[in-house]
Amino acid sequence: MLLRIALILGCWSILSEGAENDIAEREDRKRPIWNMAHMVNAISQIHEFGALGANSIETDVSFDKNAKPEYTFHGIPCDCFRNCMNWEYFNHFLEGLRNATTPGNPKYRDRMILVVFDLKSNGLYYDAQARDAGKNLALSLLQNYWNNGDNGGRAYIVLSVPLLKHYELFQGFRETLKEQGHEELLEKVGYDFSGNDDISDIEEAYRLAGISEHIWQSDGITNCIYRGFDRVIQAVNAREKFEGIIKKVYFWTADKPSTVKLALGESVDGIMTNYPNVVVDVLKIDEYQQRFRFATIDDNPWEKYKPYGK
């Protein structure tokens, strides 16, 4: 009798393990999605949008006359039905962000895994300040977010620049982290040009910057205006090239369920939205639940998605 029970339990254990493996395999086949809360410029909003299901945020960064990051602020005009005026001093915001993304901190949110800094380099006094802006940004992040490399925030960072001619901002950022002895932190940093330029021009700007990895590509417009998906399709096609440098594509700003569905239908990796809960609801629908899942910290945002086994 005891032998029979042992055999039954053993078989049940094997079957259970097999079922768990099947579930894990099905999850691996799903495209991870970064649910990106738009215009998160106050510390309180990190937690507000996280509670709505965001696993990523986008934050606006303005610079002072000396090309130092000064505020997290968008201002008027901004998206329809949003308060455009939330703000923090940049370094103070970084401290709040570090608290929200550092395991063990009482304010830690384990789902918050990526931050897009929308760098308002078009507000610099001179184009020649772009490199200095990158240097100053690196120093601010190093001290106030990464805590000088000592148990800082763990979120991945995407530096998003609106103008191709400001590619030197990326160079200044990278040079500074290397000079400060923290080149390893570049593994946490990605890049994006957000001006909806031609993909070929964007690739040339990255060539000039000396960057060929960790590249996201955005496409979109304010939620006040409809935008089609022609350029999204171009970006996705560029991503799918065997030797293409683009690894992830995200669309902004998608607030309606219909827009979210269209974006997912084009196989984007990220959706920037004013309503992360809308994206959550769409991914609960069987058609989308079978193909997509929300990204976690274990998903590498610098790697092209490949279905399990391919």
UniProtKB/Swiss-Prot annotation:
GO BP field: killing of cells of another organism; lipid catabolic process
Cellular component GO terms held in the UniProt record: extracellular region
Propiece residue ranges: 19-26
Single GO term (MF): toxin activity
Signal peptide per UniProt: 1-18
Residues holding Mg(2+): 58, 60, 118
SUPFAM superfamilies attached to this UniProt entry: PLC-like phosphodiesterases
Reaction(s) this enzyme catalyzes, per UniProt: an N-(acyl)-sphingosylphosphocholine = an N-(acyl)-sphingosyl-1,3-cyclic phosphate + choline; an N-(acyl)-sphingosylphosphoethanolamine = an N-(acyl)-sphingosyl-1,3-cyclic phosphate + ethanolamine; a 1-acyl-sn-glycero-3-phosphocholine = a 1-acyl-sn-glycero-2,3-cyclic phosphate + choline; a 1-acyl-sn-glycero-3-phosphoethanolamine = a 1-acyl-sn-glycero-2,3-cyclic phosphate + ethanolamine
Protein name: Dermonecrotic toxin LiSicTox-alphaII2
Primary site of residence: secreted
